């Protein structure tokens, strides 16, 4: 988390003026929008418990992808990365695509502007 935070801060500095940081800033011109994600949260929405690599099994990945309306991965697919990074990226991408079309996802409580917010949480609280 520490290393990722430091890398993220450097990237935010580099992207200053080129991207919107949601929910702190509103995207008014269809520019790049950066959102905070939490892959385990998206797996949980799909009723997959991301414990001890369970979420990286092909059947669990496909269950999660299907929940978000994405295609199945081919038989024999094995996610790469030391911490199942590819599995996390695949499901996060599917979740962002599926959730971003729902207007309620973009409407956050006032505290989110000061504290930040994980994309999809408020929607999920109403959904579950």
How would you describe each model-predicted region?
Residues 1-128:
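RNase H-like (RuvC/DEDD) metal-dependent nuclease/polynucleotide-processing core
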């Amino acid at each position: 988390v520490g290393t990722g935070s430091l890398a993220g801060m450097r990237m935010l500095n580099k992207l200053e003026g080129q991207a919107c940081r949601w929910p702190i800033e509103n995207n008014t011109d269809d520019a790049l929008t950066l959102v905070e994600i939490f892959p385990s949260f998206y797996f949980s929405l799909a009723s997959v418990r991301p414990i001890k690599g369970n979420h990286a099994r092909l059947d669990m990945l496909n269950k999660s992808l299907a929940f978000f309306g994405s295609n199945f991965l081919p038989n024999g697919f094995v996610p790469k990365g030391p911490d199942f990074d590819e599995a996390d990226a695949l499901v996060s991408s599917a979740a962002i695509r599926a959730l971003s079309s729902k207007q309620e996802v973009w409407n956050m409580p006032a505290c989110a502007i000061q504290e930040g917010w994980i994309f999809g949480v408020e929607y999920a609280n109403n959904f579950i």
